[in-house]
């Protein structure tokens, strides 16, 4: 089964629908949420604390497996230098990272204390709670909000989110604006960021797209943020629908039984051609790309990045 491009929908909405229906939008949430019952609360919290600091799912599982609540911070510190970091935590090194570990260890005895002690009901209050914690700027507080709301079932009201979004989704948002203007709606030129995100949320809601992993609500600004981060790379040919499913599934290989358990709950990998848009549509975006048109199946080539639309 493939997701067919629908010309009556803008490309950004086709893309968002495709990553939503395949759970490619946030597959790690499905994996952790699905394994929680078997892991138990304490180990789940160790996995999540590891993710908060290193953002590498495989290592976080290994760490949770080889530590206890009592020695977790020490084990984390002892493996500080050589531990893999996820791309999002590539700068969590040197004195900045050590200062963060020290602060957390000094203030929270266990990973459970850390997670539950910093939770707040509103995103604006969550930002304040994490304010004193080194290496937890707006981007990772946003990630923590996802951990609470989507994985732990501890809802967070998304108040004032637009004011604190990381910079990356705004780049995707501007591509949506350009696309909608190109489709003939000049009014998008005057939309504020708030109006843009409200528009995108309303369009995904009309399609009934649900938020992973529990599917307990429709997509909102938090999932739209994720989609916008991916959309920029999709338009420039460095991403494809299903890429995160592959990446995060592979990140669990070779990290022990807990990682294998999470991998068993990862959404299934899909074919690279699950969603393909006509070259004539893609040509509207990413002016630096070379497009080889072959019917409705374009091969988009970006220097040094390979071909992702095929």
Swiss-Prot record:
It holds the Pfam family ADDT. One of its GO terms (biological process) is symbiont-mediated suppression of host innate immune response. InterPro entries: ADDT. Keywords: Host-virus interaction, Inhibition of host innate immune response by virus, Restriction-modification system evasion by virus, Transferase, Viral immunoevasion. It catalyses: 5-phosphomethyl-dUMP in DNA + putrescine = 5-N(alpha)-putrescinyl-dTMP in DNA + phosphate. It comes from the Viruses. One of its GO terms (molecular function) is transferase activity. Mutant am37 contains a normal amount of thymine, no alpha-putrescinylthymine, and hydroxymethyluracil. Mutants am36 and am42 contain more thymine and less a-putrescinylthymine than wild-type. Belongs to the thymidine aminotransferase family. Transfers putrescine to 5-phosphomethyl-2'-deoxyuridine (5-PmdU) to produce 5-Nalpha-putrescinylthymidine (Nalpha-PutT) as a step in the pathway leading to thymidine hypermodifications in the viral genome. As a final result of the pathway of hypermodification, Nalpha-PutT substitutes for about 50% of thymidines in the viral DNA. These modifications probably prevent degradation of viral genome by the host restriction-modification antiviral defense system. This is Putrescinyltransferase. It comes from Delftia phage PhiW-14 (Deftia acidovorans bacteriophage phiW-14). The gene is gp109.
């Amino acid at each position: 089964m493939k997701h067919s491009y629908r010309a009556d929908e803008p490309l950004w909405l086709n893309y968002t629908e495709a990553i939503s229906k395949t759970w490619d939008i946030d597959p790690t949430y499905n994996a952790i949420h699905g394994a929680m019952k078997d892991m138990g609360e304490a180990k789940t919290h160790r996995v999540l604390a590891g993710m908060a600091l290193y953002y590498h799912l495989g290592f976080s599982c290994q760490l949770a497996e080889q530590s206890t609540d009592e020695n977790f911070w020490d084990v984390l510190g002892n493996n500080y230098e050589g531990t893999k970091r996820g791309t999002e935590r590539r700068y969590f090194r040197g004195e900045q990272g050590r200062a963060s570990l020290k602060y957390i260890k000094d203030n929270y005895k266990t990973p459970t204390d850390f997670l539950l002690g910093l939770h707040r009901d509103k995103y604006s209050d969550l930002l304040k709670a994490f304010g004193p914690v080194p290496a937890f700027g707006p981007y990772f507080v946003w990630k923590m909000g996802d951990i609470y709301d989507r994985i732990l079932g501890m809802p967070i009201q998304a108040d004032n989110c637009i004011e604190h979004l990381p910079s990356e989704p705004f780049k995707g948002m501007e591509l949506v604006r350009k696309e909608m203007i190109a489709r003939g709606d000049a009014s998008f030129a005057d939309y504020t960021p708030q109006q843009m995100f409200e528009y995108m949320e309303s369009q995904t809601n009309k399609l009934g797209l649900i938020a992973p992993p529990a599917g307990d609500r429709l997509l909102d600004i938090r999932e739209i943020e994720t989609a916008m981060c991916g959309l920029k790379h999709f338009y420039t040919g460095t991403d494809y629908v299903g890429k995160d499913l592959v990446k995060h599934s592979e990140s669990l290989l070779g990290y022990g039984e807990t990682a294998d358990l999470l991998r068993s709950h990862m959404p299934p990998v899909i074919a690279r051609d699950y969603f393909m848009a006509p070259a004539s549509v893609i040509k509207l975006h990413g002016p630096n790309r070379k497009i080889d048109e072959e019917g409705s199946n374009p091969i988009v080539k970006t220097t040094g990045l390979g071909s992702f639309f095929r």
